[in-house]
A protein has these predicted regions:
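Cytosolic Rossmann-like ligand/nucleotide-binding regulatory domains
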Residues: 6-69
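Short glycine-/aliphatic-rich beta-strand segments at the starts of folded cytosolic domains
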Residues: 1-5
Length: 69
């Protein structure tokens, strides 16, 4: 698992509408908004600029995804 920020290409969209899992091989499992605690991610969760996200997947995939932020 890797903690990173939401990449610009995914902000303003629901997780279900992004291609994060398909294109990058990672799953967003939790989201933390500034001033709030972590919450579980769902398909209808909208990512916002500045969100911290936890992603899971293969080490190589999670590290590559983190570099997009």
């Amino acid at each position: 698992m890797v903690k990173t920020t939401a990449p610009a290409f995914a902000t303003g969209r629901s997780l279900g509408a992004t291609s994060i899992r398909t294109d990058h091989g990672v799953t967003v499992v939790a989201i933390k908004r500034p001033g709030e605690g972590f919450t579980y991610a769902a398909a209808d969760t909208i990512l916002h600029p500045g969100d911290t996200i936890i992603v899971s997947g293969k080490v190589r995939d999670t590290e590559r995804f983190a570099e997009l932020s």
